[in-house]
Amino acid sequence: MSILDQIEVPKRGAQIITICGDAGTGKSSLAATFPKPVFIQAEKGVERIPAEIRPAALPQVVGSHKDADGNFINNTFWDQFKALIREEHDYKTLVIDSISALDRLFVSDILLQDGKANNLNSAMGGYGAGFSTLATKHQQLRKAAEMIRQKRGMNVVFIAHAEVDRVSPPDQDDYSRYSLRMTHSKSLPPYL
């Protein structure tokens, strides 16, 4: 058998994508049209999707907190994510709405875990280590998305809000630069 006899068209697999846009532009509504979606909500938004395409959604994720004994109670995001990997269901698309809101929850978690810091720059020992910890959380999320894609064959859609900067170079026309609205640029690569 020759090498060329082994050529075949690859089967289409599940996708991992990021939808980015301004508020109210229909990012969640677009994601709701994907095959059999279920939303993990880091912010409210599913209720604004037209009723005829409104998807199933898990309860809105809340931030971490400490119990009466001072034990760190993690937010439900990872619990919801793990349930979609481990438990039987017929959903075909996981939508995370939104990574911009989830980023804020991650920041709150880091500051709560540190206990002393009041900003990311001084968190986790200072010298910007909080930003690296934040970036690691986003990398873990991207790896978890790959895991659910491989193990469950699910599409994963990350919804992100856009941050628009006006750029005025001296030798060119002004233009707008769009990027994902995140706390720090180190958190962007997993979603691009």
Residue spans for each PLM region:
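Phosphate-binding/switch loop-helix module in NTP-utilizing enzymes
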Residues: D69-G153
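Catalytic micro-motifs at enzyme active sites that drive phosphoryl/nucleotidyl and oxygen chemistry
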Residues: Q6, A145, S185-S187
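Conserved P-loop
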Residues: S2-I96, S100-V107
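A broad, low-specificity signal for short, low-complexity segments enriched in glycine/proline
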Residues: M1-I3, I17-G21, N118-N119, G153, ...
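Hydrophobic/aromatic ligand-binding patch that stacks against planar heteroaromatic rings
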Residues: S28-A31, M147, L188-Y191
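Phosphate-binding/switch region of NTP-binding enzymes
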Residues: K151-L192
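Glycine-rich loops and low-complexity Gly/Arg-rich segments
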Residues: K44, V62-D67, N118-S122, M182-K186
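Glycine-rich, phosphate-binding/catalytic loops in enzymes
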Residues: A56, I110-D114, D174-S176
